[in-house]
Amino acid sequence: MAQKGNIGVTTENIFPVIKKFLYSDHDIFLREMVSNAVDATQKLKTLAAQGDFKGEIGDTTVRVSLDEKAGTLTISDHGIGMTEEEIDKYINQIAFSGVTDFLDKYKENANAIIGHFGLGFYSSFMVASKVEIITKSYKEGSKAVKWSCDGSPAFEIEDADKAERGSGIILHIADDCKEFLQKNKIEELLNKYCKFMAVPVAFGKKTEWKDGKNVETDEDNIINNVEPLWTKAPSTLKDEDYKKFYHTLYPMQDDPLFWIHLNVDFPFNLTGILYFPRIKSSIDMQRNKIQLYCNQVFVTDQVEGIVPEFLTLLHGVIDSPDIPLNVSRSYLQSDSNVKKISTYITKKVADRLNSIFKENRKEFEEKWDDLKIFINYGMLSQEDFYERAKDFALLKDVEGKYFTFEEYKTLIKDNQTDKDGNLVYLYANNKEEQYSYIEAAKQKGYSVLLMEGQLDTPMVNMLEQKLEKSRFTRVDADIIDRLIVKEDAKKTDLSKEQSDNLTEVFRSQMPQLDKTEFFVEIQALGEQNQPVLITQNEYMRRMKAMSQFQAGMNFYGQMPDSYNIVLNSDHALVKKVLEDAEANTAETLKPILAEIKGQEARLAVLHQEQNKKKPEEITQQEKDDVHNTEKAISDEKAKRNEIISGYAKNNNIVHQLIDLALLQNGMLKGASLDAFLKRSVDMIK
């Protein structure tokens, strides 16, 4: 006779709340249903091993089946089953004890509910309008029972016709969830959540191509691997086993660099395999490629908090029964086991890298360009990893040679220490574009590092903080003699008037490039150095680069690129330009320069007079005199600049020198490059 009653829940009609309010990810129901069936099967195996079950275990396969016509999805097992009393206890009562409390506590963290309060079974009501359980306990003399519920607090229990032990859960899929009656959808979910469960899971039958079409065979379509690689002893595995498993997880990826097999049972349980993938570009820098499992049941690929942030770039699998199936972010932040796991993984990765470095440095160096992104990220984001990695992290020079931090310091300390005792690390980020600057450094006997990685800018900033009395400077940040200043610089022999004229000759002819500023300066660099150089200020360039990494630095990112045009006043061509400029403009400029000198002398007298007075004693007339004199000077200088600019405009040597400097820096393009080529041909005819 059928028994009817109400589920032990004080809130009316809890199931719509489960379905609509608590869960955004309805897919999770299938994981819960299948993992419950797997648990029931494993419990039977345990009872048999302990001698508490004497019968035949028989077929342990968990089966998932669809009936599109009936609108049902069924999950069945041959596990321990349930008696009527157990259904009442575990389905009607325990699952909803304290339901009001958990609704209040977990409404902000919906995914933390299922499992935490035994709600795994009731997740089925996220997709089903009615659920039926037909079950028979393994216990001798047990009767089969059918339980059914339509989503209200009311349920019904009645006798059932079932000969074999185990349970079958029949989900009558709701009208708004019909996608869960599609074979492809169920295959997708089973592959996501169940592909490594510890008991065989079958979904339909295997097919074969016959008579021009796919036809079903009698063989079960087992969707999972019950003994994934991480559950096996590392000593029994070969490299090919690890690579094959990697490609099972990530079919389209290249072979990994190497891997770490995790296996610890105290003070927490943790197994897994972490792979170092080959990252070829920023496009490949994808997090959330590590899959978290609990007893071979997929939990999530959002592993922040479990795996240190820098290792979220790794691929692989972590399995720990100490992390529940349904984890919340707050849980991860507070749980002591999770913190221990994170620390353990960091240590394990550092130890593995260190062992490769010590045992086979050649192999380590060969893989460094691929490993660098992981190690640098770790050193930047985690102090304890920096301390572990500083002895095996490498620096690479432009010749392709590798050095530890200490080795490189020893290499350069004698020749690359400036007059203030600072060790100067020169680096380039593009060997081709910065070739001439690199060569200039080599001619001085300097070593140049190659820092072309995605994280090298923040690494440079960090190393300047970590390495005592050290600074990093890009080779094109200044002229070579000022990159490592060993003595006071030689001053130019030009007068102020000559410097002003020469500066204006070149300043007036600089190209107008979008978001780019040029500042002209004059240095005495020696007759053998280049006539014109372009350098980029190290601080501003680095701040612009850092704006891509740090919030709050957008100000620098919006600023124009700033370059210095350095004129070598010792070079014959620069001297010739100045001489020609003076010869061609002297007569025209003579009265203007005289006027400027006269007005500047007058301005000096006016300032001298005002300096004798308090601000409030200075009359408006005196203020106007200063303003008018300053304006007169400005007007005369504008006239001077216009005359010099007119001369420079028609001076091919000026244009050629500027374009050569731009060309050297990869900044001469389009119409400007075409004009340079034509001018070059004309000048050598």
Predicted segments with their positions:
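GHKL/Bergerat-fold ATPase module in large chromosome/replication-associated machines
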Residues: 113, 131-154, 174-178, 184-685
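GHKL (Bergerat-fold) ATPase N-terminal catalytic module, capturing the glycine-rich phosphate-binding loop
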Residues: 1-175, 179-180, 188, 195, ...
